[in-house]
Regions:
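N-terminal binding-site loop/beta-alpha segment at the start of enzyme catalytic domains
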Residues: 1-66, 70, 128, 203
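Short, acidic/polar
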Residues: 16-28, 88-105, 153-157, 180
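Acidic (Asp/Glu)-rich catalytic clusters
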Residues: 26-29, 50-67, 103-108, 135-137, ...
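A structural motif
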Residues: 32, 108-111, 142, 167
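Hydrophobic residues within beta-strands of alpha/beta enzymes
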Residues: 35, 111-114, 145, 170
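Structural motif corresponding to the early beta-alpha repeats
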Residues: 64-92, 117
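Active-site groove signature of glycoside hydrolases
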Residues: 104-123
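Beta/alpha (TIM)-barrel catalytic core signal, keyed to glycine-rich beta->alpha loops juxtaposed to Asp/Glu
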Residues: 118-274
């Protein structure tokens, strides 16, 4: 299962509302090959993502060329008036129903990754949801499983120990309040787990404005955002970008046209520790 090709950067679709389909089309046409969404109508138009993907599938782009990732969002994260599954059903059935809704919304027969949007109220409930996701994995409905919004290393370690299908992805907000998940990122790297970052730019205006980043941006004729994204990708992190700007889409994909030197990466790393 974990042999799935790792995307280098992912287009995120939260909060796009009725612009979702058009933005997904633009992202794919500019070159994004990984899309993140969620079965959570409160913040995502998952069906719009599916329609956008379908519009891009052609003789030159197959479903297999795309990495499609969605999430099971627990009841606590749903709009009670728009929950995409029966909130009164047993938890395992909620996961199954949400997954079926996602396949329908995304017009696909499988997911590249199914992510638990957040840990549940306690470890027992989280394990129950994970077992339901493992059943989906067993049936080849999801090629990988992951967890998001998991900032407690001990919690992640316990899930990893107990899981029969190990987490292949951890997707967390990348910000100073959690120390940029230093320990979690080490844990992931040691176990071949892909660490995905979100809010990478939004939560870090101080990094983007720092003179170290500004100097690197000037040296490489890039933007501060490109410097931060490139640093992270060279560290093995897969960033999400939810930009609505086509110019920024192009810039985000252009980060792989240059590389930071080792001493430059150390300088940026020092900023994350300060």
């Amino acid at each position: 299962m974990n042999s799935v090709a790792r995307p280098r950067i992912i287009y995120g679709t939260a909060w796009k509302k009725d612009r979702t389909e058009a933005l997904v089309i633009k992202a794919i046409r500019h070159g994004f090959r990984a899309i993140d969404t969620a079965c959570q109508p409160k913040h995502y138009d998952e069906a719009g993502v599916g329609t956008g993907i379908a519009a891009c599938i052609s003789d030159t782009l197959n479903r297999e060329d795309l990495y499609i990732q969605t999430k099971f969002t627990p009841v606590s994260g749903q709009d009670p008036y728009r929950t995409p599954y029966d909130p009164h059903a047993p938890l395992a059935e909620q996961v199954t129903q949400s997954f079926a809704t996602s396949l329908s919304n995304l017009a696909t027969s499988y997911l590249d990754c199914l992510v638990l949007h957040s840990p549940l109220a306690d470890a027992k409930r989280t394990a129950e949801a994970w077992r339901a996701m493992e059943a989906i994995s067993d049936a080849h409905g999801a090629r990988q499983l992951g967890i998001s919004n998991c900032y407690n290393l001990e919690y992640l370690e316990a899930l990893h120990r107990s899981a029969r299908v190990k987490p292949a992805v951890v997707q967390n907000r990348f910000y100073a309040e959690t120390g940029y998940d230093r320990e979690i990122r080490v844990f992931c790297a040691e176990r071949g787990i892909v660490y995905q970052s979100f809010w990478t730019l939004t939560a870090n205006p101080h990094l983007l404005a720092h003179e170290t980043v500004a100097a690197l941006a000037a040296k490489y004729a890039r933007t501060p955002a490109q410097i931060l994204f490139r640093y992270l990708t060279q560290e093995g992190v897969v960033p999400l970008t939810g930009t609505t700007s086509e110019a920024h889409m192009r810039e985000d994909l252009e980060i792989f046209a240059f590389e930071l030197r080792d001493e430059e990466r150390r300088a940026v790393a020092d900023l994350l520790r300060s």
